[in-house]
A protein has these predicted regions:
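Conserved aromatic anchor
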Residues: 2-11, 115-126
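Serine-esterase "nucleophile elbow" of acetyl-processing enzymes
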Residues: 184-244, 254-263
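Substrate-gating cap/lid alpha-helix
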Residues: 313-349
């Protein structure tokens, strides 16, 4: 496999990659070139693993390849020019790469300790599916193809992101392998990536909510793309206990299981968006928030509610083909009015000038893009110290 990697464009939903067998000086910046050995528009991360058989004809060999890439929007329309042509001299390891490459690296950057991991990797163009394996210890067979004896979870998926349905408290490893259309391995396992989310680390602050807090946006980016998580921009350490898909009731129901073991001093709570857009009455969401507050206080945890940013029903319909309750704005206003009367942070304040979330801040109408997450984090960084005077910052 040939491995290509480039700096991400955080406004892109996809990328177009062209590969040439010689250096070219006649390629237009704003249009595809002629004579490419390979071209694809179906790249959703800033990297690609492409089989040599998809690039070269039988018997062809090249000591050097040349490539370029440009960002695309959701409709696969360019939003920028092609990059400058770059040379690629395939190293032995690149040519022989037979497994996907992990992209999710936990516990390194700010906001990268999450209870519900998302296993993200660079896919292989010739693969039909992938098996992700999670183990309790480092796998004993890094060069093998069999499951590890330490396996605790695995799942076969067709895309390059697996949302773990279970909370992972403690230390684990994850890895992935590619399979063909018959379910046969195309190669071995990827390197095993360790990750740790442990109450023994004594987190002072926890983040609790749905996918808006879990992270991700612009359809192609998930929670392991840290630039799309507001926790990445916080000035203080925080463990992310959020789970994508949560309604306010679901957040209530998992409080004892997911929050209590960590026993943070403060829990930042943002939940209810999925409930309100589905037509759940504001009064029910408020009741759920009150129940979360009480559960926290009963455990000696200080609950801090956060207001809900607006959504964009047209964007949600376009991205997910889902309807939005017609009275969502009034419901959001009622819930946010309650939140503002409580110990809270007005995370929705940066968006008060808009009745709906602008497309350039949330392309899918629901999940804020990196700019929106940065704006939310700025408010949290400004407001939390008054509610948490003993806050430990970086």
């Amino acid at each position: 496999m040939a491995y290509f990697h480039w700096a991400p464009d955080l406004d892109a939903a996809a990328y177009e990659l062209e590969i040439y067998g010689e250096e070219r000086t006649d390629l237009p910046e704003d249009a595809p070139g002629r004579g490419a050995l390979h071209r694809t528009e179906r790249l959703y991360t800033n990297s690609a693993l492409i089989a040599m058989g998809d690039i070269l004809q039988p018997g062809e060999t090249y000591e050097r390849l040349w490539w370029r890439v440009r960002p695309l929007n959701l409709d696969r329309e360019p939003i920028g020019p092609f990059s400058a042509l770059q040379s690629y001299m395939p190293a032995r390891g690149d040519w022989q790469q037979t497994s996907p490459l992990p992209r999710a690296h936990f516990n390194g950057e700010r906001g990268s300790s999450i209870l519900y991991p998302v296993y993200s990797f660079t896919p292989m163009e010739n693969a039909a599916s992938y098996e992700v394996e999670v183990t309790r210890r480092e796998p004993e067979n890094p060069e093998g193809t069999a499951p590890s004896r330490y396996r605790v979870f695995s799942k076969v998926i067709a895309n390059a992101n697996l949302y773990d349905p279970s909370p992972r408290i403690g230390t684990y490893w994850w890895r992935v392998r590619a399979m063909d259309s018959e379910g046969r391995p195309l190669g071995g396992w990827s390197r095993a990536e360790p990750f740790r989310t442990d109450p023994a680390d004594h987190w002072q602050v926890a983040v609790l909510g749905d996918s808006i807090s879990h992270g991700g946006g612009r359809l192609s980016y998930g929670p392991a793309d840290w630039a799309y998580s507001y926790a990445h921009y916080l000035d203080f350490p925080a463990v992310n206990l959020s789970e994508s898909g949560d309604t306010s009731r679901m957040t209530v129901d998992r409080f004892e299981k997911d929050v209590v073991p960590f026993h943070p001093e403060y829990v930042l709570i943002m939940t209810g968006t999925n409930s309100l857009r589905a037509g759940v009455p504001a009064s029910e969401v408020i009741a759920d928030l009150k129940e979360i507050q009480q559960k926290a206080r009963d455990q000696g945890i200080t609950p801090i509610l956060m207001t809900l940013p607006p959504i964009n029903p047209a964007g949600i319909r376009r991205a997910f083909d889902q309807p939005t309750a017609s009275d969502w704005q009034a419901a959001f206003q009622e819930v946010n009015a309650f939140i503002r009367r409580e110990p809270s942070i007005d995370a929705a304040a940066p968006f008060r000038q808009w009745e709906e979330m602008p497309e350039d801040l949330a392309m899918d109408g629901l999940h804020g893009d990196w700019r929106a997450k940065e704006m939310m984090a700025r408010v949290i960084n400004e407001e939390l110290p008054r509610l948490a005077p003993d806050l430990k910052t970086f």
